[in-house]
Design a protein with these regions (language model features):
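Extracellular, repeat-based ectodomains that mediate carbohydrate processing or recognition
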Residues: 1-203
Length: 203
């Protein structure tokens, strides 16, 4: 195992860059995402990413993932996809989902080129959807988030194929086994891991 010196990931260094996440890609390279304050000159956070070779050499420059720049784009997460690319998710309060906050995503190919447009992850848009997480597996990826419904927060899941098409609908996860309705109280801050065959662990 080779160890390389630490280095600064972000090129833009003014203000604050925080909340990083990283995914190892199929070709051995990796991609890192973070939120950066006022880099888009809008007095809010935006989501940026940088690709690196396996030895940590930057591949191209850093780029903004979010199209909407009103409000804040925060809490980014990234996962590798089985086609060699990656997908980035973030929480967005620009109003693009028609309410206070939603979860937005963007797919990229192995070269870091955006595939299609930013897309809305959550189908239910009333009130707040946030605290996203994402995991990739063979043929697709899965997203989870917290959604404020019926006066408390619950965890929802949505599967996607690698083209960005939904596989089924969003599914309530935080419920007692065999029950049709959500658990009482708040369930938040979920995380997700996937095996290659698409089996999921959600906490």
């Amino acid at each position: 195992m080779s160890l390389y010196p630490e280095s600064t990931v972000n090129t833009f260094t003014a203000n604050q860059q925080s909340s990083p996440d990283t995914a190892l890609l199929a070709d051995g390279s990796y991609v890192t995402v973070w939120q950066s304050y006022d880099q888009d000159a809008n007095n809010t956070y935006g989501v940026y990413y940088q690709r690196f070779s396996a030895s940590g050499v930057p591949l191209g420059g850093e780029f903004r993932a979010n199209t909407a720049t009103d409000g804040g784009q925060t809490n980014p997460h990234v996962a590798a996809t089985s086609d060699g690319g990656f997908v980035i998710l973030w929480d967005d309060d620009s109003g693009v989902d028609g309410s206070s906050q939603g979860v937005i995503g963007q797919r990229f190919n192995v070269n870091g080129i955006a595939q299609g447009a930013n897309f809305l992850v959550n189908t239910t848009t009333a009130s707040t959807q946030f605290q996203n997480a994402v995991a990739g597996y063979t043929g697709g990826f899965a997203t989870v988030w917290a959604s404020y419904i019926n006066s408390d927060y619950d965890i929802y899941l949505q599967r996607w194929d690698n083209t960005g098409a939904k596989v089924g609908g969003e599914t309530l996860i935080s419920k007692t086994t065999g029950a049709a309705t959500e658990q009482a109280g708040n369930q938040q801050s979920s995380d997700i891991a996937a095996s290659a065959n698409g089996d999921l662990v959600i906490v």
